[in-house]
């Protein structure tokens, strides 16, 4: 406001600045960028395997928690990663991250599972076809890659979102705190559920004889997973 004669009166204001985050406990690995993954496993002779779709069925039991990084990409469904997906992840993150202040590590192994395919126009029969390529099986709830360092989630979220959209299964960028909050919300939803007719109760009581239509996986996973798909609306 102006004083007498239109002269501005100087006033001292009190400003409160937000304290910067503390990065003192972060340990950087020797190599800050993602390492190159081999297209073919280094084994003398690979045996041709059945499909074994159980590799991508249900929840993951490994790589479900953060180890070094603060941010990462979380799979919300099952699927197979080809070597091209590994290169896409490595190149996209490598171009966008600052290796002096950030680091990234893999949470999935290199392609190890052989996938066979017969040549185009080949007739039926004649045994199993030759190995065409190798893939890595990923289950729902597994971390694909971790990113950490002296950075905030807003800095890494754009390129992590770009990577997550190109993966062959539903995935989201997430932080360490966000993962913990997501699990707390799922637990609260389960404890505060007002609907008495849950999937677990209906199946346990064998209502309308539905057991004969369900598999042992449905009983074990309580209907939250349908093959490789994660049904997040189920309680």
Where do the protein language model's features map onto the residues?
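Ribosome-associated RNA-binding proteins
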Residues: 1-235
């Amino acid at each position: 406001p102006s004083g007498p004669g239109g002269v501005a009166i100087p006033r001292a204001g009190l400003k409160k600045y937000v304290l910067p985050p503390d990065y003192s406990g972060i340990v950087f690995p020797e190599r800050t960028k993602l390492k190159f993954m081999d297209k073919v496993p280094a084994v003398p002779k690979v045996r041709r395997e059945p499909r074994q779709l159980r590799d991508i069925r249900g929840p993951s039991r490994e790589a479900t928690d953060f180890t070094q990084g603060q941010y990462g990409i979380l799979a919300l469904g099952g699927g197979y990663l080809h070597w091209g997906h590994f290169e896409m992840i490595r190149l996209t993150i490598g171009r966008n991250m600052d290796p002096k202040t950030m680091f990234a590590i893999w949470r999935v192994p290199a392609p190890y599972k052989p996938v066979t395919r017969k040549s185009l126009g080949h007739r039926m029969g004649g045994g199993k076809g030759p190995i065409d390529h190798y893939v890595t099986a990923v289950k729902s709830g597994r971390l694909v890659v971790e990113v950490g360092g002296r950075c905030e989630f807003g800095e890494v979220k754009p390129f992590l979102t770009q990577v997550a959209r190109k993966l062959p299964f539903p995935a989201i960028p997430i932080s360490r705190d966000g993962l913990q909050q997501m699990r707390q919300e799922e637990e609260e939803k389960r404890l505060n559920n007002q609907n008495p007719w849950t999937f677990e109760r209906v199946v346990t009581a064998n209502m309308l004889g539905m057991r004969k239509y369900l598999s042992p996986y449905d009983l074990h996973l309580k209907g939250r997973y349908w093959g490789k798909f994660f049904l997040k609306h189920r309680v």
